[in-house]
Design a protein with these regions (language model features):
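Structured binding/interaction patches within domain cores
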Residues: 1-131
Length: 131
């Protein structure tokens, strides 16, 4: 689970600027470390989940794509520090939420939905595995 968290944190750090929530940042900082305790995981997981819930309420009835992007970044951070259960894939879950964040950002900026997030995620994974 430690390697899953480390890769997930690297992937989500690419989209973190869409959130800028200190609780999300704390979750990513903890997930990026190999030496995290269960107590640390519990604290940052709860904080990241609170950020996720709050970001969802900020999205509003009229879709604000930038707020939606921030919500997906928070969901990605929650995946980074979530409980590792049999069959779970923390890095995959975080990567999918990061892709959703990037898609929302491109819609918000009028760039459409084309982006290279998946390619960048594979590059990050390859770099991690080669170290």
């Amino acid at each position: 689970a430690s390697q899953q968290r480390q890769v997930a944190a690297r992937i989500v750090q690419r989209v973190f600027p869409m959130s800028n929530d200190v609780r999300v940042k704390a979750a990513l900082d903890v997930a990026a470390r190999a030496d995290i305790s269960d107590a640390e995981l519990t604290v940052v997981s709860q904080a990241a989940n609170t950020a996720r819930v709050e970001s969802f309420t900020q999205c509003g009835k009229e879709t604000d794509w930038s707020a939606q992007a921030g919500h997906f970044v928070a969901k990605a951070a929650v995946a980074c520090v979530g409980a590792a259960t049999p069959g779970s894939n923390l890095a995959w879950d975080a990567a999918m939420q990061a892709r959703m964040a990037r898609t929302c950002e491109t819609v918000a900026t009028g760039e459409g939905t084309e982006n290279r997030e998946a390619e960048e995620q594979y590059r990050i994974l390859e770099a991690f595995l080669n170290n």
